[in-house]
A protein has these predicted regions:
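Substrate-positioning beta->alpha
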Residues: 174-177, 185, 198-199, 210-223, ...
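Conserved Rossmann-fold NAD(P)-dependent oxidoreductase catalytic core, especially the SDR/UDP-sugar
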Residues: 126-173
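Amphipathic terminal alpha-helices
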Residues: 1-22, 54-55, 329-344
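Conserved beta-loop-beta element that borders a ligand/cofactor-binding pocket
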Residues: 144, 183-208
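Glycine/proline-rich active-site loop of Rossmann-fold NAD(P)-dependent oxidoreductases
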Residues: 152, 180, 196, 206-219, ...
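Mid/C-terminal beta-alpha module of Rossmann-like enzyme folds, strongest
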Residues: 259-302
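N-terminal Rossmann NAD(P)H-binding glycine-rich loop of SDR-like oxidoreductase domains
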Residues: 28-48
């Protein structure tokens, strides 16, 4: 768990939701990608509830050192375990409730490890679906706004039925297409093996638990601001995207785990959180008392970047289930910068 009062406040906000935790009694819950931004906050949330509601929790990651650093605080929970494992490899493990958070999620890895980007969302997912299909629990596959591809110019915001353009004959398409295949694989297991699953499609995320090596533009802006540096913008900054603060994302994931309709996908985004990259860059520069500077990327770096220029999510469907985001963009940026500054 991060040693930061703002992170603990975020955790308390998530836990304040009235969710039917007792339905997890007797379950064994697995979180893959446990050391990532989403997985780590999800593990800390679940660990806070496991004793009172009688379920086991397994945090899985390829990085044992990070597991120990983040979660040794939970070692006093009798049913808590940390497992170092790559989901692409077969595993001798039985879990009936699974949150599949493991994935390459930033441009540098899309470019440098395109094979791993695809396999985690397909082969790793299949291994976990096989495990889940032998039980009667629920499976959560974290998908992404990236499944929509580029806006064709015919809508202002993507609902869950939208299908945009993806140039599939590129390295960068591996992330988008593997998330699409992953969703289809969940549907196949639901149809053929009766698996109960739900798919949150997350917008671009940020928050105190973000990794310091995250190469997404937004993450780099936040790190620049936390260090008191100029914000480095590697484009004109006119990309118009939806964003979501990490605690709102976890709140939505858990809400959909308990209340989402089986077999459905749901867009997840933040409170009043649709902005251009330039808007965010100038806001963070203002917070840090610095400036925005422009630095065009080289070819290798550019290969990992999204080509989308407008990716705004319509979250009417998830709101209809009773969930609402709580953290505004300005507040989320401020909280993230303050938290990151304490870690640097």
């Amino acid at each position: 768990m991060l040693d930061c009062h703002l992170y603990r406040e975020d955790l308390e906000r998530i836990l304040s939701a009235n969710l039917p935790w007792e339905s997890l009694r007797g379950r064994r819950v697995l979180v893959t990608g446990a050391t990532g931004m989403v997985g780590s906050l999800l593990v800390d949330t679940l660990a806070s509830m496991m004793d009172d509601h009688g379920f086991e929790l397994i945090a899985m990651s390829r990085n044992r050192e990070e597991l120990e650093r983040l979660f040794s605080i939970h070692s006093d929970h009798e049913g808590f375990r940390m497992i170092e494992h790559d989901v692409n490899e077969q595993m001798d493990l039985s879990c009936d409730t699974i949150f599949h958070c493991a994935s390459n999620t930033h441009p540098r890895l899309y470019s440098s490890d395109p094979i791993g980007t695809i396999t985690t969302n397909v082969i790793g997912l299949r291994n976990l679906l096989e495990m889940a299909s032998s039980g009667d629990g629920r499976f959560v596959f974290l998908s992404s706004v990236e499944v929509y591809g580029q806006n064709r110019g015919d809508v202002d915001a993507f609902d869950e039925s939208y299908c945009g353009y993806i140039d599939c004959n590129t390295v960068r398409a591996g992330y988008n297409e593997s998330k699409r295949v992953g969703e289809a694989l969940c549907q196949a297991y639901g149809s053929q093996k009766g698996l109960d699953f739900v798919i949150p499609r997350l917008s671009r995320l940020y928050g105190p638990s973000m990794r310091l090596d995250d190469s997404k533009a937004m993450s780099q802006f936040l790190l620049n601001s936390a260090r008191g540096e100029n914000i480095v913008l590697k484009s004109k900054g006119d990309q118009f995207f939806s964003y979501c603060y990490a605690s709102d994302a976890i709140s939505a994931i858990l809400h959909l785990f308990f209340h989402g309709e089986s077999g459905n996908a749901y867009n997840v985004s933040g409170l009043d959180s649709d902005f251009t990259l330039a808007d965010i860059a100038y806001e963070l520069a203002s917070m840090a008392g610095t400036e925005v500077v422009f630095d065009l990327p080289d070819e290798k770096e550019r290969r990992g970047y999204s080509t989308a220029t407008k990716a705004v999510l319509d979250i009417s469907k998830v709101k209809a289930t009773g969930w609402m985001p709580e953290v505004s963009m300005k507040d989320g940026l401020r909280r993230t910068v303050s938290s990151l500054a304490s870690r640097l």
